[in-house]
Amino acid sequence: MNYWEPVDGEDPELATAADGTSVVVQERFPSARVVKSLNQLGYHELDEHHRPNGAPDRIAVGAAGDDRLAVREVMRLVDRLGFDPVDVGPLENGLALEPDGSPFAATYTADELSRLVAR
């Protein structure tokens, strides 16, 4: 999730989440299989930029999570939706996909996104 106070209401814990909002969600629901993905692009980009597998202009969507099986499942979904999935590692790495992260609201190839989140 991306925390937006005007939409989500005031939540100081989410507003100051040093490891990202999805880590807070995982802590609140410890038995959930939380994967942060499909949040770095807006709905219009998801609609406009999906491409078939192998297309040279296919863009990447990151997936972060501590449950590796759940991450793989989400990555398969991302691929079926028409994007190149990029495993960005544990859930705390999903912070890079949030509004202050450089991949947010930008289109990158899988290689470019991998390099951005590896920093």
Q: Can you say where each PLM-predicted feature lies in the sequence?
A:
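Rossmann-fold NAD(P)-binding glycine/threonine-rich loop
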Residues: 1-52
